[in-house]
Amino acid sequence: DPEKFATMVVKQSGSGAGGDLEPTFIECRAEGLRVYEGAKVSFELKTSQISKDAKFQNLIKKVAREAPYRTWVSSQGTPMDARYVKRDGLFITLKDKNGKEIKVQTTQLSRASQQIARKYEDARKAKRPDPSARYVIFLIRGKGTSAWSQASRVCAQQGCKYGQLPLDGEGEIDLSLFSGS
């Protein structure tokens, strides 16, 4: 009886990623996949349909395409979807999805967005790849390895970054700690 299982709270680790993650969670179960949008279930998919399902394929393509983008927040709390281009003195250049370049003073960004900009600068100074905010995190149930294997193959084929987290048990999943991250 699933109601008797404890709720599993998924939280960010101390990996240094901080609150700048914008993951797409996909639960891998014996029956197939359960795809989350935010903290809520968006759709479910049987294992046999994973490699053929257009909705799933399009989701993975979208996550791969948007990997360089993230939600930047102004000091007034206004969100903006853009990718980091460069820093020039006190100004940061961002580019939105329409290709428009936006120059903002670092002081016009929230502290969290300023910290994210520093991560880009540090990565570039060290000649490492830019940090990605958008990727898939597979939440793998004990009997969900077949679904995970097929879904991760789709990610690899589409060039979508992904990670995995094994789940110990069958309880409900709580993703609320990622809301608004």
Question: Locations of the language-model features?
Answer:
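Extracytoplasmic juxtamembrane/flexible linker immediately downstream
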Residues: 1-44
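Extracytoplasmic
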Residues: 19-23, 30, 67, 77-79, ...
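Soluble periplasmic/extracytoplasmic beta-strand elements of cell-envelope proteins
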Residues: 23-29, 34-37, 83, 93-95, ...
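Short acidic, S/G/P-rich loop/turn micro-motifs used as interaction or catalytic elements
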Residues: 32-35, 142-147, 170
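Periplasmic peptidoglycan-binding/anchoring modules of Gram-negative envelope and division proteins
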Residues: 43-66, 81, 115, 122-134
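Compositionally biased alpha-helical segments
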Residues: 61-124
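A non-catalytic structural micro-motif
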Residues: 139, 156-172
